[in-house]
Amino acid sequence: MSVHIEAKQGEIAETILLPGDPLRAKYIAETFLEDVVLFNQVRGMLGFTGTYKGEKVSVMGTGMGIPSISIYVNELIQSYDVKNLIRVGTMGGIQADVKVRDVVIAQAASTDSQINRNTFAGVDFAPVADFSLLKKAYDAGIEKGLSLKVGNVFSADRFYNDQLDKQQLADYGVLGIEMEAAALYTLAQKYGRRALAILTVSDHIFTGEETSAEERQTTFNDMIVVALEAAIK
């Protein structure tokens, strides 16, 4: 057990999918996994382990934002020796060719959070995805005929932030805005683990097009399948 996860040793797989929403974790477990076992419900952060195509895979919510995902990733790695961590979440698109419901693979994650500057004494550390996981996910998506976008995303420290210059981010090629990937990548690099963020565009920040809360919780299956295929290859 750890402070925020009640699983026993051996109950969490070496590879875990990490949606922000614990109800999406439940949906993934019930829809895609077999022989599912609940391993965590501390603070309502549901975690499950099952099998996908015969391979052991876990899925667990992380909550929203860098502080929350940092807690769970630290504990999953330090207390349960998880090797591969794949975020499956949503983002707001900011490029004209990034459409609502598109699947984006985050090659790198910029951020306005001070967490890395505090860690690295003012140095701008560049958090990046694990290339082997990225390639597996990309290949899986192409095999399924998906039009994937791969590139830089922005991990925002605040959801509501009128001062963030989103147009400047778009001008520099950032594909969209989410809230967790930079922390996930930084911690994976710190501990020598593999991490990837696969994201579905839930809304477009400039056009105003958006999906419903229910759709965000219970659909976006393309992203989930790409993540699971990357997890077992």
From Swiss-Prot:
GO terms for molecular function: purine-nucleoside phosphorylase activity. Phosphate binds at G20, R24, R43, R87, V88, G89, T90. Keywords: Glycosyltransferase, Transferase. Its EC number is 2.4.2.1. The record marks R216 as: Important for catalytic activity. Catalyzes the reversible phosphorolytic breakdown of the N-glycosidic bond in the beta-(deoxy)ribonucleoside molecules, with the formation of the corresponding free purine bases and pentose-1-phosphate. This is Purine nucleoside phosphorylase DeoD-type. It comes from Listeria monocytogenes serovar 1/2a (strain ATCC BAA-679 / EGD-e). The gene is deoD.
